[in-house]
Amino acid sequence: MTTVRSNDATQPSPQTEGLLDQLSAEFHATACVVVPWFLDNMPKMYFQDTSPEAQRVHLRSILAAKTSGRPIDVTLKSPDGHSITAIRSGNRAGVLADIVRDLPMDSSLRAAKIHSSKDGELVIDTFEFGEQEPYDKSNAAQNAAIETTIEFSRTHHPSLQADALRKFLIGSSARYLTTLTPLRMCRHFELFRQISGTDKPIVSLESEDDPTTSRITIAVSNARTRTMLERAARILMRHNASITRAHLDIVQDAPYGSVTFVGFIAQWADHTRIDAKDPRWAPLHSEIMRLKWLDFRVVELIGRRPEFTLPQGELISAFADLVRQMLVPTDALAFSRDRVTSTMESRAAITLPILELFTSRFDPTKPLADAEFNARSATLRTTIDAISDSDDAREIFSAFLRAVQAVLRTNFFVADRFSFSVRLDPALLVGPTRPELPFGVFFVYGRGFHGFHVRFKEIARGGLRVVKPANAVLFDRESERLFDEVYGLAFAQQLKNKDIPEGGAKAAIVLEPPAETNRCVKAFVDGILDLITPEPVTRSRIVDHLGREEFIFLGPDENITPMHIDWIVAHAAARKYPLANAFMSSKPNGGINHKEYGVTSEGVNVFLRIALLSQGIDPTKQRFTVKITGGPDGDVAGNMMRILHRDYGANACIVGVADGSGVGEDPQGLDHAELERLFVAGLAISHFNPKSLSAKGRVVKADTPEGVQLRNSLHNRLVCDAFIPGGGRPATINERNWREYLQPNGKPSSPLIVEGANLFLTPDARISLAKAGTLIIKDSSANKCGVMCSSFEIASSMLLNEEQFLKIKPTFVGQVLEKLREAARQEAIILLGEGRRHPSVPLPELSTKLSLAINASANAIQPAVASWAANNREIFREVVLNHMPRELSKTVGERIFAELPTAYLEWVVAKGVASRIVYREGIDFFASMEPSAVAETALRYLQKELEMRGLIQEVQGSKLQHAARIAALLERAGIRAALLEIET
């Protein structure tokens, strides 16, 4: 199109003048109607909250829409992107939630001002993003607001302390101080005092001057502001409450984070005030209290299925995840998360009675009797069996019913819970792929996560890990195998824990992106504590079908930080858990931090040294090459790099390291000093300084397809003497890809693997690689020292407070490290010795047989230990004191026997005796005995051991020519020979 320039730009054409006049008249006519209406109908707070310029911008947008005859649907964005204003026709139910839903997710919502016209024809919602402008002590207006508020509090809120109120106001923003009234700031402070440093929300309800409206204020710590505002608006909509005005404000709560205040001026849909005595308020209040901890799937579910209440929606979502874990081994595709959930949603006629069965059974006010529960279950079983249009639906509901029947405890009725948790009958999840029956299983479901805790003994311990998939596809994959991973890790831990009183356990939660780690860890732990704390108020809300007290001991694993550890211990104490100090190991101060002391790696190093010696390499005298997965910033891998240099110096040649960030490779060996720098700084291998490489070395980041391929294949590609998996996902080497570990000539790329990381190899892969000539030290042997260290820490935590522990910590830790190295040495020697005697049996199989032999023997010994304490006190005491680090025994004395739980002491003795005998006499020592004979033989063994010590001392003190030789033979074989004596 060609534009023709007018010869006289200052004189508009008659056509232009006519159009301008017409438009001006239309705008003027519209303005004459809209402006007075606007000034009369917008609430007073709108004009207080909104600058004159912003008011004019809003009016111009409204006029443009009105003049054109279109509905008002305008979104205004400030030039800097820090402010968005949504102007909409009509204050219909849910309009605020819909507007908030469409706000950008990548910006932090710092404030919101929601206003609707008095006649309900218009809403103007303004949202501010980015960091708040903090209080400025040089700003006179802000200082005046603080002083005015403090003066106001003296008259109207005399219970508020001026200094605390001032600190609160200083932690607010400039906008907060200059826009809120003294009354509102005082009311906020009253709420702030109640939740500061906590994770529980609080809700207040106040009357407004308008007799038809009320003010609902929600105060919540460390919440996502955008999410909180949207959820609150949706819950109000579900309960037929209309929002006429709303505000969102944030105040700092150092050192705990921040507190968000979401305030609504609202009324019921029938234009009546919301009153606390109104029966409609209690369910609304209850659901608001759940908002911070509620999964988004629940909010979406009740939005599309209004026939379900919020509590029912939560149960459907939770049981869908549990049912999926039950059915995944059958058909992972048919029983995906979405298909299980949609089946439950779409068949409410079956779902609702199952939910009613669950809630009735565990309602603490009137729990369903067992007979009635069984009768209803049978009726539902018949209904489910009659489903004829879908085999999958029948399977899903059958599993759903079995899951409900397997629940022994639940926190569903506990007030202020962070998550939904159940203690399950462990038989629920046992099957062909999970043959061993755990002792106990917990399932926890919450906002953005679900997780399990599995243990194989009454007293058990194991780490808590957080799995953080990067996207939805990876989340689905990790979620699908979650229980199998926890089950496998717990069973591996059971094998690993053969030297300590605790059995094997593991906990893991998988986060759905973009779920926040801290919140999910807190929700999971709180859900477990709900079910095990004896605190009376909590117990009164739990119907118990288990019938016994339970103790859980956790430790840190992937993505658990020192901050989490401190919070977990403090929260356990706040929840009145009796062994709070022992609830979590590796406490930064009152514990033994695994990474700081390298406890796991110390054991891995002992196994590596003895295995290298068995292959003709003395690492203290000869150069050897090693590749490692896991970065210098990791616990096991990083400490291995440090210890290899400490113990072997230049002999230890680390030719390759791979972690999540990339790879570092150098055939001359990666520079030890540079690796040490990365370890101390907590940096990944991608930060390795290329200047420290040889001419053939390289560092490649995993930010390209080539880098990812190099990272994922390093453990297969590099040819060296030993491979130490010190990090990486379970089943990295599996039955499908184990051949990639072999060289073209069929020989393994490293003839020795020492598994510092758990489950890096699958059982089938281990067997195949062993047959191909690889000597493999299995994870349950190689990295057992980490859990052993935690066990010693737990013992000290049950006997000492933090102050007492810190006084003995240096000596105590040194003695623990001695015990760890000795335990690793004993096992390495017997394993390799058994391997020489049974060359056709793969070493991983011997490792498992060793663990099973010790555990089975301990299981047979434990029931008899109670009588030992009474009738063989000297032996009982000797075994307990031999297990404990000397400094702990010296410090607490007889309190060891008075204060440690009886069951714990019995397992100290049972495991201590079993491991002592099997390490000395061999895997098959107890194999041919009846279980009833094991305890008797073990006791006689200990008695003969005491006798032999006396004989050895006697021989050593004699003047016999071969006294030393005789004493050595007695020590080596005297006990077993003495056992063959016939007692007379």
Which role does the model predict for each range below?
Residues 637-638:
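Short terminal or interdomain "cap/linker" segment that borders an active site or interface and mediates
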Residues 641-645:
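Short glycine-enriched nucleophile-adjacent loop
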Residues 1-251, 266-294, 329-333, 343-353, ...:
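Regulatory modules associated with amino-acid/nitrogen control
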